[in-house]
Design a protein with these regions (language model features):
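Glycine-rich nucleophile elbow surrounding the catalytic serine of serine-hydrolase chemistry
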Residues: 28, 105, 123-135
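A catalytic-pocket lid/entrance helix-loop region that shapes and gates access to the active site
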Residues: 69, 135-198
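Short beta-strand/loop motif that positions the catalytic acidic residue
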Residues: 375-376, 381-384
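Conserved alpha/beta-hydrolase "acid-adjacent" motif
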Residues: 389-394
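Catalytic histidine-centered segment of alpha/beta-hydrolase-like enzymes
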Residues: 413-426
């Protein structure tokens, strides 16, 4: 087990230790507070600590043999068992220990190693599940607890992905609207639909087929000049058929185009990846408008490949180990179609889990800890944006009720609110961590801090993983 620590800048007035987790399952925790620094007041008063989750590089990496299925039918009907067996073969006895509860108990071991009586906790995304679990198991050792972008405990784990799908599509529409609002800079169109048309053409150029994602709603500005007298009828017809047209056109093209596969489009996969983070939206616009030269994607190093492999293996094993949401076998045809026929990057992940394919042939090893605020001395703080696609607001309220948390509702739809330069929210987070309370209940969405007209100068951007060498 590896622990990282950044000492409090004002040791004379240090209040304690703040342990953070960035999410996942499978997120690398060790560098969290380096790339997502808390507000200055928190850096002054707390040692910033991260405990690498078990299963990852730095946390005894899970090793797995190569995935090998006799045929596609066996892979679909026994996917979870094959996956578990291949990891068991390479790491005997270890896969069964990969659970959120054990990760929480590892944090408790870290507390002993640090020699402190209480920990303050900051969890983002899946980190909210982990930190709420720790607080439930060890309330006597829990001080402040911040739950940033909270996972719905009732969806663990088969339902989580499908709950995200509508939000991801909605955030892409919001991205198109944002680009259209900056048409003076990007010249991609003055309406979301106009931007989408250029985006769709780029996807088709890269993949050989158009995307199956429906276009944003048409507006008056999208009506052809000759049809202005029938604007409302035109708009209604376009919007009513948008989803069906996109799916049909993608399917026909996929069937007729050798090698046509929308998931081969770097623009499409990057758009889906960055939808929950407005700081990356300018990068999509810059690439789409050809305002910046395309750079060759950076080839990952062997260490990066090892870390990514361990992360993916750990995530799947952990989720199947503690899966509680019933599988929906009726969704198997839709899951196979989305994953194997049209490669729908928006719908495929959720359907893969909801249908039960991801854990097929296995049963859960444990029941997740039922989280609660029993015994906590300080009321937890929960933060969520209203349109967060990755941890939808409605689901986050389930964890809020379970933990009796004070809620700060953030505007917009960014996922993860730490280190976004949101001054009102940062002040509230600092106030809570230092005093144990805050009266703030709402905050605006964070500003976009990425340059709008050029690529960031920082090297090693995570955007390099999205298919373009940004």
């Amino acid at each position: 087990m590896t622990i990282s620590r950044i000492p409090a800048r004002d040791q004379a007035h240090k209040m304690g230790v703040l342990v953070g987790n960035p999410g996942g399952p499978g997120g690398d925790a060790l560098g969290l507070f380096s790339w997502a620094a808390p507000p200055a007041a928190v850096q002054d008063r707390f040692d910033l600590v991260a405990v690498q989750p078990r299963g990852l590089v730095g946390g005894t990496a899970l090793k797995c043999a190569k995935f090998n299925a006799a045929n596609d039918f066996v892979a679909v009907t026994n996917y979870g068992a094959i996956n578990r067996d291949r990891c068991e073969a390479a790491s005997p006895g270890y896969p069964a220990t990969l659970t959120t509860e054990n990760a929480a108990r590892d944090i408790e071991m870290a507390r002993h190693a640090l020699g402190v009586n209480k920990l303050s906790l900051y969890g983002i995304s899946y980190g909210t599940t982990l930190m709420a679990t720790y607080a439930t198991l060890f309330p006597q050792h829990t001080d402040r607890l911040v739950l940033d972008s909270a996972v719905n405990p009732n969806g663990i784990w088969n339902r989580v992905g499908s709950d995200q799908t509508p939000g991801y599509k909605g955030r892409v529409n919001a991205m198109m609207a944002w680009i259209a609002a900056h048409d003076n800079l990007y010249h991609l169109g003055a309406t979301p639909l106009a931007v989408y048309c250029k985006w769709s053409a780029r996807v088709e150029k890269e993949a050989g087929v158009p995307p199956s994602l429906a276009a944003p709603p048409a507006q008056v500005g999208d009506v052809p000049p000759g049809l202005k007298a029938w604007s409302q009828q035109y708009i209604a017809g376009v919007n009513l058929t948008a989803d069906a047209r996109a799916r049909y056109e993608n399917f026909v093209a996929t069937m007729l185009t050798p090698g046509g596969d929308q998931s081969k489009s770097a623009m499409l996969t990057a758009t889906r990846t960055v939808a929950p983070d407005r700081n990356y939206w300018p990068l999509i616009a810059l690439r789409l408008s050809n305002m910046v030269p395309r750079r060759k994607a950076v080839k990952p190093t062997p260490d990066e490949v090892a870390a990514e492999t361990a992360s993916n293996n750990m995530q799947t094993i952990l989720m199947c180990n503690e899966n509680q949401y019933p599988a929906q076998p009726a969704q198997i045809p839709a899951a196979l179609f989305a994953n194997l026929v049209v490669s729908d990057v928006f719908e495929a992940p959720g359907l893969f889990w909801e249908s039960g394919i991801a854990c097929a042939g296995t049963t859960p090893r444990v029941r997740p800890v039922v989280t609660s605020n029993r015994g906590l001395a300080v009321t937890p703080l929960l933060i969520n944006s209203v349109d967060d696609p990755q941890t939808p607001y409605r689901g986050a309220m389930v964890l809020r009720r379970a933990m009796g948390a004070h809620l700060i509702t953030v505007g917009g739809g960014d996922h993860g609110q730490l280190a976004r330069g949101n001054r009102p929210l940062d002040a509230a987070i600092s106030q809570y961590l230092i005093t144990g309370r805050t009266a703030v209940t709402a905050a605006p969405q964070a500003p976009i801090t990425t340059p709008l007209n050029r690529l960031p100068t920082t090297s090693g951007s995570s955007s390099e993983r999205f298919g373009y060498g940004w």
